[in-house]
Amino acid sequence: LDLFLYFSTDEVFGPAPEGVFYEEDDRYKSGNPYAATKAGAEELCVSYQNTYRMPIIISHTMNIFGNRQHPEKFIPLVISSVRDGKKIFIHSNEECSKAGSRHYIDAKDVADAVLFLFDNHKIGEKYNIVGREETDNLELGLIIADIMGKPLNYEMIDFHSSRPGHDLRYALSGEKMKAMGWEPRKDLKDRLKGVVKWSLGNPVWLRDEDEN
């Protein structure tokens, strides 16, 4: 085995206060069972490295999107909702005045980052793979609706009451990878145009599993 890359998640760090961007070695504070299982799996990887000298690195990646994404995910769900004139529910704070925010990253950028790490890594290290800009989900929905030339019918809902353990804001620092020579190349708005066009041209990928 030359290298084992474990894909973890930004969620292991828990919610990020405004202005905070978690670095790779910051303390974990999982906000839900899914995040806890990912953090536990990271520790299992570390134990295999320490015990069996397995060559392991770990990545934290957040909110990957692209063609063929599952229709339940936010971006394809917005596309299908705008297309059909349906209401989209957007997770927000308790007052329903601020939408949750993320650093969305194109799947092609993630693949590029992985290839970069194959040639540029240090065994036992962790790496954040982060999108170029932070965007809240209402802004993202409005961008998609504008691309489609249709209105966005939406309702803000309290994120925790609708999905316990869901964090309003996730944020990672991409400075480590940047210092190594890697940065995402895809512009969010330009890539969204491509995803919208592809999804509308391949509507089977927007179809819910319950649909015939």
Predicted feature descriptions by range:
Residues 30-42, 69-76, 103-104, 134:
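Short-chain dehydrogenase/reductase
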Residues 13-14, 29-33, 57-74:
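Flexible, glycine-rich beta-alpha linker
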Residues 82-212:
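C-terminal substrate-binding subdomain of Rossmann-fold SDR/epimerase-dehydratase oxidoreductases
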Residues 15-17, 31-57, 82-83:
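Active-site Tyr-X1-5-Lys
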